[in-house]
Amino acid sequence: NANVHRGIHMLSQEATALHEAARERVRSFLNARSTAEIVFTRGTTESLNLVAASFSQAFLREGDEVIVTVMEHHSNIVPWQLARERWGFTLRVVPMDDEGRLDLEAYAALLNERTRLVCCCQVSNVLGTVNPVREMARMAHDAGAYFLVDGAQSVPHFPVDVQELDCDFLTFSAHKIYGPTGVGVLYGKEALLEQLPPYQGGGEMIARVTFEHTTFERLPFKFEAGTPDYVGTHGLAAAIDYVEAVGLDRIAVHEEVLTRHAMARMAEIDQMQFYGTVPGKTSVISFNVGQIHPMDLGTLLDRLGFAIRTGHHCAQPLMARCGVEGMARVSFALYNTEDEIDRFMEALQRVVRMF
């Protein structure tokens, strides 16, 4: 077991080479300009907390505004609330319509000279809605604001190019793309990352330390305090190799076929309520059936061999917008089949008949 960036011996050099090769793999995958723009974290949650803490310290003061959307994961809401308590800025929220489509007219009205940053999921983890983040980023930039994309639910399902999006930050997690847990990525434009203070202090993120002063390492290392999960980053690189070998365009088409098939079959059930019906959504279907509690649906489906998610899905403000406490959610990946969906439907119909 040899640490990275710390030893001159062969094992450390080999570990470092694998770790930095993974960084280059991520850079290429996202089409970032430089590996200096790729920061390894513990996941999307830590990436968002890093931006919230460091961006707020560098740029936000009382009277400034940050915009989020009603469909954000708690990880893109709570860190901003915590930062707001310290720095005194205002948090604004973009609403959506009943189909799960962001209200871009309301978004345009929220943008003003006080807006410093807009934070938006590219894909809702609840609704499957694919948000027009490229257009939204352009609108933010026209208003003089930066734009952050939560890519946790998009990066595994279709190609994401940070140059095309022209986003200032993008985050995602390895485990969402068939990699290991506990590893994530923060992409940030180099010039912007240079302006942000470190998120944590410790080993390897420093250039020189005295009791009077500390100078920090160059990018991206000033944001990577302590021993990184260099085994996990190598696993992430392997996962990227895997999805690119399959083909992200092929994955997107396959999952779209599965989603259409599943929604058509599920609509056969009386009192089926879908949440998120915007055309072109990704392979996430959130639903309720009549007055059946989603926890009951999930428990009984589990006994029949089907694993679904139930509850508020780390999106309680979105649940409130939809007028429910929770939902059941079924999702599909590249390895699922239409036959599995048909067998899921048999199980779901059996469960519904119990009530």
For the regions a language model picked out, list residue spans one by one.
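Pyridoxal 5′-phosphate
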Residues: 1-355
